[in-house]
Amino acid sequence: MSVMRSKKELIQSTVRIGVLCCAGLLLGGLVGLCGDASTQGFVHISMIDNSFSPPLQRIPEGSTVLFKNIGRNPHNAVAVDGSWSTEKTYGDLVMGPGAETKVTYPESGVFPFYCTFHATPDARVGMVGTVVVGDVEYEQAAEKKQEAVKEWSGKTRKVPSEYPTIQTAVDASNPGDMVLIAPGVYKEEVVVTTPSLIIRGEDRNKVIIDGEHVRGNGITVVGADGVALENMTARNAVLNGFFWTSVKGYRGSYLTAYNNGDYGVYAFDSQDGVIKHSYASGSPDSSFYIGQCYPCKAIIHDVVAEYSALGYSGTNAGGELYLINSVWKHNIVGLAPNTLDSELLPPQREAHIYGNIVADNNNIKAPYIGLSWPSFGNGILIAGGLRNDIEKNVIINHPNNGIVMLPNLQENFWLSHGTIVKENVIRGSGRADIALVGPISMGNCFSGNSYATTIPFGLEFANGCDAPIRTMMGGDLSMMLGALSMMMDAKLGNLESGDYKTQPVPGPQKEMPADEKEKIQPAFAPFEAHQYLLKSINFHPEAEEYLKGEHGSSSYVGSMQPVVPSGFLAILYHIFGFLLPFVVYSSWTFTALYDMHRQDKKSPIWIAAILVLPFLGSGAYHLSGQSSLPGWYRKTMLWAGAGVFLTLVIIAAALVL
């Protein structure tokens, strides 16, 4: 009889908890429906990285458009005819992440517009859009694109002996021409729309494109396939040093990009490319970036990235994408393939990270933007990525993790699954040499790595790459809460970013060899032409030298220590977000079992529920009236700890989302 009563009470308590949860969800939904009325009645155009959504918007005469930057890069919107711009209403040409402004259109007409940072001024190629106002006819014109060519045309246009600026030489060129630049400091911003050009400096260290911190990009290649940029330096741009966007076929070699305000060497919405023998540093986003492409069919080989927020960032990029035999050091994080909703083609997937040296990525003086700060102190970080491959890398001296896979949150919650981690050497990690972070992880495998610690324990044993079955595992929630606290610090301005304008100036970099200078070739099918780089993947030639250097031993404390750097919020969320639930679980479970013992209750159903269902079983026992503890005591015990935890989560969500 007592067993039947226990069953009934258990069911009633569980139903009661379920009803409360549903009520909470309903209340949350009602609050969400209320929304923010401040943007009602306006047509919206979102600025994504790097496109407008929607690209064509029709509105009645006299209507208003709300432009909002939901990406990570700075953007703007400027009418081709100059009749309006977001600069006039926003007050600044640069609209950073989250910025918004309204533009009203009192008269009918067709208004093509463009982003001055990511498109050509005629709104023909790149980040462009159109607003059609009123009842007017509009049919989008089809532009005839120039075709790329395979070979050099035989024509070389020399700067400055024949053309006073790089831009005038580029504008005069036909597909397949070479623009050869003599040593000098060129204070200009170059936009390339002609395919298959070879733009080369005579001396890598003496041919310098200087943005003087007032011009957007060093060289931008917009919609022009097959353009090669070689043997020169770009510095002090407001945005990017060398930038290809919306192209098929690109090559960058013997490039130096330093102290630019967004990226160093950047390929976006582009396929079939190679970046090699290059150096980039001092960028608040990343030194090297390949983004929004699938399949990318791209190779980054023999590059050095340092003094940036991210050595490499590959948002929504993958599919035959290879990052090989390069050095990533002295950044906030070494390499960080990631998924974000603010760019197209999510999720990030199928990148191959082979034979790299990833060292000392804990540079607190590096420049950064808010989203990059939570990745501090990690070597290789996969944020919401799928089916990536990490092999034969040397990863040393990181205060948090050597290799870490964690979820990423923007509009959607992206988990990291299916990563292969094999034959890496990891040393000197502050939390774990290899770590899984988040509530759940599936399909990741680990084999043949040289390491000291993992979180959770026994990753290679439970999920070997040759095992027929891989175990579904939870991860390090402490790291996830620590990253959340660091994101809050960035949002609140609690941390001062390093200034990209004052990062260390690199010394002379390796010149393009004479035998390579004899080859003049557009970037026609460069991915196929560089397949020889992928035939044999080995450790980096300098791997032994790095391993002989000084590096600390990996920590065995793991999840019990806060993330680094441990500010006030990191410690607060570690104690009350990570450790407190263990205390709450222990107190609920112990008091329930102790109360049953004191009352001499021997219900196997309640005992099983308390032990097998964490929180739910013991919570149901105390709420059902089974407990003899005073009501005030039970309520305090049940709601105090849970209330503190939920309060912290709500505060974090309000600040971050």
What positions do the PLM features span?
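Short glycine/acidic-rich loop motifs that flank beta-strands on beta-rich extracellular proteins
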Residues: Y186-V192, R204, D210-G218, V238-W244, ...
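Acidic Gly/Asp/Thr-rich repetitive segments characteristic of extracellular carbohydrate-active
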Residues: F52, I59, A148-K187
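Acidic, glycine- and Ser/Thr-rich low-complexity intrinsically disordered tracts
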Residues: G91-D92, W414-H417, R427-S555
